[in-house]
Amino acid sequence: MIWHVQNENFILDSTRIFMKAFHLLLFDGSFIFPECILIFGLILLLMIDSTSDQKDIPWLYFISSTSLVMSITALLFRWREEPMISFSGNFQTNNFNEIFQFLILLCSTLCIPLSVEYIECTEMAIAEFLLFVLTATLGGMFLCGANDLITIFVAPECFSLCSYLLSGYTKKDVRSNEATTKYLLMGGASSSILVHGFSWLYGSSGGEIELQEIVNGLINTQMYNSPGISIALIFITVGIGFKLSPAPSHQWTPDVYEGSPTPVVAFLSVTSKVAASASATRIFDIPFYFSSNEWHLLLEILAILSMILGNLIAITQTSMKRMLAYSSIGQIGYVIIGIIVGNSNGGYASMITYMLFYISMNLGTFACIVLFGLRTGTDNIRDYAGLYTKDPFLALSLAPCLLSLGGLPPLAGFFGKLHLFWCGWQAGLYFLVSIGLLTSVVSIYYYLKIIKLLMTGRNQEITPHVRNYRRSPLRSNNSIELSMIVCVIASTIPGISMNPIIAIAQDTLF
């Protein structure tokens, strides 16, 4: 009898939960239409992979790419709509969130053609790779629109789990296994730290989880200047720091970059930073509104450490991927300047603009590394010597991307950094901007060192890898080269394009 009553209660509770979920999807589903397109693409990929043979591999690429492009289109059609909060306060839709979602989708769209030939040559499982990329993209998009503490925790976990699997995708590679282990352990530790910070925030606000309601709760409980908020700030900064990978939370970055498959590194190097930056702007700006001086100081310390350590250690690297890992640590220091400046003085607009340029610069560089690695089997910087004599197309594609990362005029990276530093200077961050300028000069040194190697014609400096290099034609239908050309063109955009990009970024501010 008791079992029968319990069974009936369970059925009733399950029915209520199902009906509530159906009601939310029915009335709020339109607010996550771009995400729904990706979910539909994931379902199609699973169905095709489980019911077809190897002959349908092109369909897998087509479906994944089409899903991403359609999701971007849905985002663009939704541009300039009124901000809306949906799913009982869990999700917020506005232009500011959507611009970050657009950047994540753009990264994923460019990474898929960049991965095609690599996957074929290394005989990696294609369907699973595409599933992990799309699922990570989905997690990043939900993180950009997250409006409560639970979603802010669950969404990056979705992204992180796929990242762990992607980084260890080449199971027979010892370096890949080592990188995955470090990534997984540090990721788990950082998630625990982040949740601990959320618990302090939850308790101090009187049990609120929505970001704006947390602010109201802190005012009602008079806890906005309490030690508990300071503890929450420290723990949350450390947790988010793992995703952004500034110093000293960068220990996992070089090993993961070196050990993971190169297309995976290209994907993780940009999407994780875009998603984490979107989350950081909302968490620091809203719940910690009353602690702005404290989190400004914390982020300034992280930015200074990142710019100095990242660029100085990059000079000593012999692996191209490790060099780019330390370079990315320095780059995130520049992005943090925009987060500190915030809404005032165009900080967020300059940060968004620089991240757009960083996507093109970084993915263009990684596309060149993928091609070089497939043709030579090496990642050593020294082995790039004399590449111009064998493959001028690849050498001349890599050079502008590296120069743009260094911030040399008239390339896109120069104007992106210029606007970012100018906004920081106007906000009074004189010391931070000065460090940024000095470290940018340091970064130019090690980028120019690589370009000098590329262009050398002296036989004694050319390694056997380049001597035996299989020369490619100037024009190719190769999907990696197509992705590379798009990124190189975007990296060399002159300053005349800055004003409309800045205007669009300014239009997204909440």
Curated annotation (Swiss-Prot):
Q: In Gene Ontology terms, what is a biological process of this protein?
A: ATP synthesis coupled electron transport
Q: Which GO terms describe its cellular component?
A: chloroplast thylakoid membrane
Q: What is its subcellular localisation?
A: Plastid, Chloroplast thylakoid membrane
List the catalytic activities from the record. Answer: a plastoquinone + NADH + (n+1) H(+)(in) = a plastoquinol + NAD(+) + n H(+)(out); a plastoquinone + NADPH + (n+1) H(+)(in) = a plastoquinol + NADP(+) + n H(+)(out)
Transmembrane region(s): 24-44, 57-77, 99-119, 124-144, 149-169, 183-203, 227-247, 295-315, 323-343, 354-374, 395-415, 418-438, 484-504
Would I find Ion transport among this entry's keywords? Answer: no
Where is this chain primarily localised?
plastid
Q: Which Pfam families match?
A: Ndh2_N (PF19530), Proton_antipo_M (PF00361)
Question: Can you name one GO molecular function term for this protein?
Answer: quinone binding
**Which keywords does UniProt give here?**
Chloroplast, Membrane, NAD, NADP, Plastid, Plastoquinone, Quinone, Thylakoid, Translocase, Transmembrane, Transmembrane helix, Transport
> What EC number is given for this enzyme?
7.1.1.-
* Membrane topology according to the record: Multi-pass membrane protein
Q: Does the record bear NAD in its keywords? A: yes
Query: What is stated as this protein's family in its record?
Result: Belongs to the complex I subunit 2 family.
What interactions and quaternary structure are annotated? NDH is composed of at least 16 different subunits, 5 of which are encoded in the nucleus.
Functional summary from the UniProt entry? NDH shuttles electrons from NAD(P)H:plastoquinone, via FMN and iron-sulfur (Fe-S) centers, to quinones in the photosynthetic chain and possibly in a chloroplast respiratory chain. The immediate electron acceptor for the enzyme in this species is believed to be plastoquinone. Couples the redox reaction to proton translocation, and thus conserves the redox energy in a proton gradient.
Which protein, by its recorded name, is this?
A: NAD(P)H-quinone oxidoreductase subunit 2 A, chloroplastic
The source organism is Gossypium barbadense
Task: Cite the source lineage.
Answer: Eukaryota, Viridiplantae, Streptophyta, Embryophyta, Tracheophyta
